[in-house]
Regions:
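Basic, low-complexity segments
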Residues: 1-49
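Helix-centered, glycine/charged polyanion-binding patches within enzymatic domains
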Residues: 2-7, 11, 198-274, 283
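Short, flexible helix/strand-to-coil boundary loops that buttress conserved ligand/catalytic motifs
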Residues: 22, 168, 310
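Short coil/turn segments at secondary-structure boundaries
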Residues: 33-34, 117, 310-313
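Polybasic low-complexity intrinsically disordered regions
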Residues: 45-61, 65-75, 79, 83, ...
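Basic, amphipathic alpha-helical segments enriched in Lys/Arg and hydrophobic/aromatic residues
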Residues: 56-57, 61-69, 251-314
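Short arginine-rich
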Residues: 88-91, 302
């Protein structure tokens, strides 16, 4: 009788530090710092006609971040900021719901990074995020009665740190392979390796990776054929070399050789994003939904910088 495999148990080496990092995530002073308060009002001048914006982009970004971290509706987040300013006796205005909704459409979100200076191993993947629709329990019990809509969040993750280095939001009719070049364009550092699943087994993906002088660790699809004849004088294709090696040693052995299992870090990051911030967005427009998801990615990076678990198999 075949015995059922038991999951290994893991323990933390840095439990005290990681516990403090988890507590720090909920600190208001982390998300609403003195620097944010000082830069709350917009002082930049565009030189164009019309009244300049009252609030800085940092102020709008901070409110959107508080909404994501504390799982509040936008109006409730505005109420939170009003109460904080009242408690601190700060005579600062707070943007209205209409202002927040409008400014969120065009807000530029930059991912906070801790650059290491070394060439990166980027692992890529995507996940679906529900925009609107019925709850899973209702669907299971009674079936669908209306259409459900999804957005796709595409991520590039630093294999060494778990930090998000690139993020793109699309509608659900974009394939993973179409978005990979855009993800790599967001990475300023040198890239030594790019890992992804079979959805990235496309010519444009290999071209984008080769343009960065990186190694592609992408398993060819099970019915894959050689793209370029072995006797040609042209440069050997990494994809064809991977396919030949898989035929020699098997797919499982090839994955071990190239460290393909590290690709699961992208899935772990997706899981963290959904567990911390939820599996759906509340904004009505696509631009607002994209901003919500990118704000979550930026907040997740800041949480990563506070401290990550250092685990070992017990």
């Amino acid at each position: 009788m075949k015995q059922k495999k038991t999951k290994p148990t893991y323990r933390l080496r840095n439990w005290k530090e990681y516990n403090a990092a988890l507590e720090r995530r909920g600190s208001l002073t982390l998300w609403l710092s003195d620097e944010v308060v000082q830069a709350w009002r917009n002082t930049a001048r565009t030189g164009e006609r019309g009244h300049p914006q009252t609030y800085s982009d940092l102020a709008i970004l901070t409110i959107c971040t508080l909404q994501a971290v504390y799982h509040l509706p936008l109006r409730g987040t505005r109420g939170l900021v009003l109460s904080i300013f009242e408690l601190l006796r700060l005579k600062l205005p707070v943007p209205s719901f209409s202002q927040l909704s409008r400014r969120r459409q065009t807000l530029e979100v930059r991912l906070p990074r801790q650059r290491r200076g070394a060439a990166l191993h980027v692992v890529v993947d995507s996940t679906g995020v529900k925009v609107f629709g019925e709850g899973e329990w209702k669907v299971r019990q009674h079936g669908y009665t209306r259409r459900r809509t999804w957005r796709k969040l595409h991520l590039g993750v630093d294999e060494a740190t778990g930090e998000i280095v690139a993020a793109v939001v699309t509608t659900n009719n974009y394939s993973d392979g179409q978005v990979l070049p855009d993800l790599l364009d967001q990475v300023d550092e040198a890239v030594r390796q790019v890992s992804g699943d079979g959805a990235y087994d496309k010519r444009n993906c290999y071209d984008a990776i080769r343009a960065r002088e990186a190694t592609a660790t992408i398993p060819p699809q099970h019915n894959a054929k050689i793209w370029q004849h072995g006797n040609t004088k042209a440069e050997r294709l990494v994809r064809d070399q991977n396919l030949r090696r898989i035929r020699q040693v098997g797919r499982g052995a090839w994955k071990k050789e190239v460290g393909y299992h590290r690709r699961s870090l992208a899935e772990t990051t997706m899981f963290r994003e959904k567990m911390i911030f939820g599996e759906q967005v509340s904004a009505r427009s696509f631009n607002g939904q994209a901003t919500q998801l990118l704000v979550r990615c930026a907040a997740l990076n800041r949480m990563t910088h506070l401290g990550m678990p250092d685990s070992y198999k017990a």
